[in-house]
Amino acid sequence: MIRISLVIPTHNRAAQLVAALESVVRQDLPRDEWECVVVSNNSTDDTEARFAAFAAAHPECALRLVAEDGPGVSYARNRGLREAQAPLVAFIDDDERVNEGFLR
């Protein structure tokens, strides 16, 4: 059962996003207890392709990418909140790295 949804809004920062995702998949919480929802906010770079490659390399993790057309991070955060499947939602930015245990 998914207990925690981690939402990451992003806009044209594919390289930073991948680094953030690398830190997310190192979490020590069991994989079936969390999901990560990345919200692409009008990205025009290779965010979608790089996310798809990352997700394919980590099939054991619940990673999803959704698109949000509303301009700005508040639209992206709200979209992520609507997409979240868990009762508890955490947010990080696409340039952040989380330590092990962050999702505990």
Predicted segments, located by residue:
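Glycine-rich, basic loop-to-helix element that forms the pyrophosphate-binding segment
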Residues: E68-A84
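Acidic helix N-cap motif at the loop->helix transition within catalytic regions
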Residues: A15-V18, D45-A53, G101
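Short beta-strand/loop segment that forms part of the nucleotide-sugar
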Residues: E33-N42, R64-E68
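Hydrophobic/aromatic residue at the end of a short beta strand that borders the catalytic acidic motif
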Residues: I92, R97-F102
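Short alpha-helix within the catalytic core of nucleotide-sugar-dependent glycosyltransferases
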Residues: L21-E22, E48, A86, E100-R104
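Short aromatic/hydrophobic "clamp" motif used to bind/position activated sugar donors
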Residues: V89
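A conserved acidic beta->alpha catalytic loop
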Residues: S23, S40-A49, E96
